[in-house]
């Protein structure tokens, strides 16, 4: 696990769009139920790493309200730019293998189906 290349690295943008749509359909309900248990409040600053099509970033934006902020980060944010996201969502290009993340500035840092694609030596040096 984590040793193989990213499963969708060579997928076309349209195929990746469809793959991520399937993930949303399968996992968004349980994901938002679990996140809701955290008690996310208005004004929170949230970071979603590997935001894909932005469904969870969109949901988080509703939780944090207009005074909160959600950063939807992905190493290839083209798919994020294809969807309409609330004004309190900022799209950012981020590769967690090569770029540092200032996690202290966030109340919540979240990822789903991401860490399995990170090489183990990065997770456990």
Where are the regions a protein language model picked out?
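A short acidic, Gly/Pro-enriched loop at the edge of an enzyme's catalytic core
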Residues: 98-108
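Class I SAM-dependent methyltransferase Rossmann-like catalytic core
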Residues: 3-28
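A short, conserved alpha-helix within the catalytic core of class I
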Residues: 118-125
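A short beta-strand submotif of the Rossmann-like class I SAM-dependent methyltransferase core
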Residues: 111
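Hydrophobic adenine-recognition pocket in adenosine-nucleotide-binding enzymes
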Residues: 114
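Conserved alpha-helix/loop element of class I SAM-dependent methyltransferases that forms part
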Residues: 25-42, 59
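Class I SAM-dependent methyltransferase SAM/SAH-binding core
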Residues: 47, 52-99
């Amino acid at each position: 696990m984590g040793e193989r290349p990213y499963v969708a690295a060579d997928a076309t943008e349209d195929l990746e769009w469809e793959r991520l749509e399937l993930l949303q359909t399968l996992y968004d309900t349980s994901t938002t139920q679990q996140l809701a248990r955290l008690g996310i409040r208005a004004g929170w600053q949230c970071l979603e790493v590997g935001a894909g099509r932005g469904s969870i970033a969109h949901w988080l934006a509703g939780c944090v309200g207009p005074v909160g902020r959600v950063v939807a980060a992905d190493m290839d944010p083209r798919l994020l730019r294809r969807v309409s996201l609330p004004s309190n969502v900022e799209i950012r290009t981020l590769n967690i293998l090569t770029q540092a993340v200032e996690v202290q500035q966030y109340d919540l840092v979240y990822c789903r189906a991401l860490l399995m694609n990170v090489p183990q030596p990065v997770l456990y040096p």
